């Protein structure tokens, strides 16, 4: 613009600068230290973000509705996502933020994404290596805290959905420096010990990214991938995602959902998959159509939204100025009132206080006289009533003594006549009680002996003593119960009463037919 150009109004120049900023800095990411933080009753946040060399004012509209669980304060180091604009009434440029991340959380999120990409590239999250859940799982290993609500939720769901199930709990800490190592050791324990577990559930309640960080450790991811037992990850709430979720064979949104998943049959899986497919397709179409309409709507009204934000910021500044003005006026009138009070107290208040003192003295004297008169009357009345009550009490006492003497004589006669009868009844009841107790004890001993004999007959070790044996595969991963699983030259581990032996299969017959 040359010197000879016609002058323009300040508002026109400001609008031009605003358009340039918003066009060239539509999306910016700024990091720095917060200062002058002010959260208004409207829910909007105003602040300044600074470093050692510069300061930038900013606003975050509707902050409280988006970040209701945490309030920033002066000195917090944050990362802001937003756009640059100009607040015209003050002629200052500012950032209008739409996302805020505290620095510590930002570092963890960055570390999470880097580790996720690296492990995914190494194949740890490959869907092809995930193991299917067994249909009708009945023995379930649960790795979680033994004292939290998580284990109770899992047991409650399993009790409702499964008629027969067995839960083997491996207690671990689910937060802190040692949590990942303890969970990894639990996975290794279930894999190394033949306990017949069909599936494992790793569970924890919700929390912040710091609380759930143990489930992002590389050690735990590798233990999950190496497990031969299918693992369900149920960590946090539905919106929480950890590396444990990506590495596990199945991810459940909550611990209760994990218990529901592990109890499902294959028919239920197929039916739910079909229902989910129909639901996703239907809602995806609706969602895309709605988002297209919403995008068109906001494109038309984008200019009006910016105007609303400017007006809202002006309103917040005006409200703050009015509040400061009201406080100033209140302080001024407090001082004036104190001054008037000092003036009045010097003359009028002195006379009023003297008159009140005289009235108080006269009133106290009158009250004392009244009290003395009433006290004298009450003493006389009390003495008269006390004498009458004493005479009545003496009369009733003598009458009660006469009645008590008569009742005592009658009671002695009644006791003497019924004592013999009661003694005979007591002897009879004692005999009946002794017989009943002896009969119940005899039946209880017989039942206990029968239970012991039944338990002894069901003990696998006792079965081995009768000449039977148990067959396992060579590595003792599973019990061999069918000849179909054997072939010639297989090595089989035989468990006998007093030891084990490894044998080689020479021939196998099925239903009297020679297999080879």
Curated annotation (Swiss-Prot):
Keywords from UniProt, A to Z, are: Cytoplasm, Exonuclease, Hydrolase, Nuclease
Protein family according to the UniProt entry: Belongs to the XseA family.
The UniProt function text for this chain reads: Bidirectionally degrades single-stranded DNA into large acid-insoluble oligonucleotides, which are then degraded further into small acid-soluble oligonucleotides.
According to UniProt, the reaction catalysed is: Exonucleolytic cleavage in either 5'- to 3'- or 3'- to 5'-direction to yield nucleoside 5'-phosphates
Record organism: Chlamydia trachomatis serovar D (strain ATCC VR-885 / DSM 19411 / UW-3/Cx)
GO terms of molecular function:
exodeoxyribonuclease VII activity; nucleic acid binding
Provide the assembly information: Heterooligomer composed of large and small subunits.
Q: What is its EC number?
A: 3.1.11.6
GO CC, sorted alphabetically, is: cytoplasm; exodeoxyribonuclease VII complex
Disulphide bonds annotated for this chain are none
Highest classification ranks of the organism: Bacteria, Pseudomonadati, Chlamydiota, Chlamydiia, Chlamydiales
Please state what class of enzyme this protein is: hydrolase
Q: Which residues cross the membrane?
A: none
The subcellular location is: Cytoplasm
GO biological process per UniProt: DNA catabolic process
Keyword Nuclease recorded? yes
Record's protein name: Exodeoxyribonuclease 7 large subunit
Query: Which one Pfam family would you cite for this protein?
Result: tRNA_anti_2
Spell out the CDD domains in the cross-references: ExoVII_LU_OBF (cd04489)
Q: Which PANTHER family match?
A: EXODEOXYRIBONUCLEASE 7 LARGE SUBUNIT (PTHR30008:SF0)
């Amino acid at each position: 613009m040359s010197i000879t150009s016609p002058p323009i109004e300040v508002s026109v120049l400001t609008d031009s600068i605003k358009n340039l900023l918003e066009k060239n800095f539509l999306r910016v990411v700024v990091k720095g230290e917060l200062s002058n933080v002010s959260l208004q009753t409207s829910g909007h946040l105003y602040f300044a973000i600074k470093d050692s060399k510069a300061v930038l004012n900013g606003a975050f509209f509707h902050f409280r509705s988006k970040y209701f669980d945490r309030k920033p304060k002066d000195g917090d180091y944050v990362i802001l996502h937003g756009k640059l604009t100009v607040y015209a009434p003050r002629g200052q440029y500012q950032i209008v933020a739409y996302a805020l991340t505290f620095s510590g959380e930002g570092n963890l999120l960055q570390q999470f994404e880097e580790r996720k990409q690296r492990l995914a590239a190494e194949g740890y999250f490959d869907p092809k290596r995930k193991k299917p859940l067994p249909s009708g799982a009945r023995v379930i290993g649960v790795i979680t805290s033994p004292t939290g609500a998580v284990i109770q939720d899992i047991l409650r769901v399993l009790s409702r959905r499964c008629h027969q199930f067995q839960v083997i709990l491996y207690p671990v800490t689910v937060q802190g420096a040692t949590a990942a190592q303890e969970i990894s050791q639990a996975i290794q324990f279930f894999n190394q010990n033949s306990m017949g577990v069909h599936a494992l559930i790793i569970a924890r309640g919700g929390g912040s990214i710091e609380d759930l960080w143990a489930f992002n450790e590389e050690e735990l991811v590798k233990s999950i991938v190496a497990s031969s037992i299918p693992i369900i990850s149920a960590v946090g709430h539905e919106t929480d995602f950890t590396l444990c979720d990506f590495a596990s064979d199945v991810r459940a949104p909550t611990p209760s959902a994990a218990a529901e998943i592990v109890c499902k049959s294959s028919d239920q899986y197929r039916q739910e998959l079909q229902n989910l497919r129909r639901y996703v397709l239907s809602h995806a179409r609706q969602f895309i159509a709605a988002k297209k309409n919403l995008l068109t709507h906001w494109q038309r009204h984008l200019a009006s939204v910016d105007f609303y934000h400017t007006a809202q910021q002006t309103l917040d500044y005006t409200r703050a100025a009015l509040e400061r003005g009201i406080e100033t006026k209140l302080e001024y009138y407090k001082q004036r009132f104190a001054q008037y009070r000092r003036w009045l107290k010097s003359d009028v208040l002195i006379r009023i206080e003297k008159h009140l003192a005289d009235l108080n003295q006269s009133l106290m004297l009158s009250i004392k006289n009244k009290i003395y008169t009433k006290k004298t009357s009450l003493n006389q009345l009390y003495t008269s009533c006390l004498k009458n009550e004493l005479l009545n009490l003496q009369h009733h006492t003598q009458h009660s003594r006469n009645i008590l003497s008569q009742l005592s004589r009658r009671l002695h006669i009644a006791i003497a006549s019924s004592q013999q009868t009661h003694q005979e009844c007591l002897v009879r009841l004692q005999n009946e009680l002794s017989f009943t107790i002896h009969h119940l004890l005899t039946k209880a001993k017989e039942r206990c002996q029968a239970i012991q004999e039944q338990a002894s007959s069901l003990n696998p070790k006792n079965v081995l003593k009768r000449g039977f044996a148990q067959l396992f595969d060579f590595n003792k991963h599973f019990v061999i119960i069918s000849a179909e699983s054997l072939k010639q030259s297989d090595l089989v581990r035989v468990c006998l009463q007093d030891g084990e032996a490894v044998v080689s299969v020479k021939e196998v017959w099925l239903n009297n037919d020679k297999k080879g």
